[in-house]
Amino acid sequence: MNASLRRISVTVMALIVLLLLNATMTQVFTADGLRADPRNQRVLLDEYSRQRGQITAGGQLLAYSVATDGRFRFLRVYPNPEVYAPVTGFYSLRYSSTALERAEDPILNGSDRRLFGRRLADFFTGRDPRGGNVDTTINPRIQQAGWDAMQQGCYGPCKGAVVALEPSTGKILALVSSPSYDPNLLASHNPEVQAQAWQRLGDNPASPLTNRAISETYPPGSTFKVITTAAALAAGATETEQLTAAPTIPLPGSTAQLENYGGAPCGDEPTVSLREAFVKSCNTAFVQLGIRTGADALRSMARAFGLDSPPRPTPLQVAESTVGPIPDSAALGMTSIGQKDVALTPLANAEIAATIANGGITMRPYLVGSLKGPDLANISTTVGYQQRRAVSPQVAAKLTELMVGAEKVAQQKGAIPGVQIASKTGTAEHGTDPRHTPPHAWYIAFAPAQAPKVAVAVLVENGADRLSATGGALAAPIGRAVIEAALQGEP
């Protein structure tokens, strides 16, 4: 072989090697990125050529696909959009997907390995490929009640969230976030409609795309006194333990004074029992109780209830709830009443109520009840999973007793005849100027108190003025409406 042919052969071989290397790089290292690139029209056309599966709740359709005559064969439809947007999320040509549309995408688009047999059968029979279906744990009656109550609870719509759990299993029965949005607009095949909707949502200062139930954390205020009380009881305190009834208390090591709501004393005597302090939600008494109990015991109890540890997906991603640093006694006093750096998601606060309702055992919360194939054959069913024991049955029973007493004091409107509720309200200061910022209003509860079927947490964000934005006035009626819906038809 002469030199010229040899050079040509080497050049051709080098080009072949380069082509093979490029193909390997594309297939192995960059394929996922190329598939995920929104500019990849081939992937989009492929995805929208398959009928995406349904998302359901209690037999109701929350999301489904309909055939179109356009370039993209199927359009996503959300029949009750604002109510269920925190659950379904959206599936968009331009803006990807969120919530269950993202978390369960392999099932919904049919690519999940458990649907391989179905895909193979479709290939050989020539059937149009279809995705699987996701059946949620949401109870439509409870979800709708939570949404309706939030829209009417603040002399108009409230900003905030409602979470309802089944204490014995961890099923998420309601997941409400307000304000919400219409995912149909983001799922539109019209680029202009999508873009305008996205712009409006992004410009809205109320952040309707934010799932306040699981993605945001808030100071829990007096609802955290449940944790402080649990820590004290576990350390040997009793309900008759005497605490200060003074209207104000100095925070150790500082010049700051902390006061009770409205600056009122907690009773006519110099001291008050733990029972009375819990029922009346006395800040000064709980500052003293927290300092007596100690930072280590308080933090340990908070961890037992799931704080300060990354939560498992439901399968939606959940923000971590935290106690925050407790460097000194002043910080401990503030932490004991759910202020300082304590921050919880509404889901975490609902878990606290559900744990007490379940005798001290925390069940892992979950949103997906079952996954089904395109033919509705069952793929998997979720069962309740015990995460941990937070407190003893005795402590849980005592907390229930105290919360029943607190409900009787807090009950202003929305009482349910014949139903005993165990609850705790909270009013949480926040922001850089808390004295001039509307506080958050909280309500956590479960019912019936002695045989719980449902546990709830309600957050009303930036409720109103400082005197009317209490958990009892704003959040509690919403929570009771949710409980009433949950107990309809119960014996």
From Swiss-Prot:
One of its GO terms (molecular function) is penicillin binding. The chain crosses the membrane at residues 8-28. Residues 29-491 are periplasmic. Pathway: Cell wall biogenesis; peptidoglycan biosynthesis. InterPro entries: Bact_Transpept/Beta-Lactamase, Beta-lactam/transpept-like, PBPA_dimer, PCN-bd_Tpept. Changing K424G: Cannot rescue the deletion mutant. It catalyses: Preferential cleavage: (Ac)2-L-Lys-D-Ala-|-D-Ala. Also transpeptidation of peptidyl-alanyl moieties that are N-acyl substituents of D-alanine. PANTHER family: PENICILLIN-BINDING PROTEIN 4B, PEPTIDOGLYCAN D,D-TRANSPEPTIDASE. The apo form can adopt multiple conformations. The beta5-alpha11 loop near the active site is a flexible region that can adopt a variety of conformations in the acylated state of PBPA and appears important for acylation. This is Peptidoglycan D,D-transpeptidase PbpA. It comes from Mycobacterium tuberculosis (strain ATCC 25618 / H37Rv). The lineage of its organism: Bacteria, Bacillati, Actinomycetota, Actinomycetes, Mycobacteriales. The gene is pbpA.
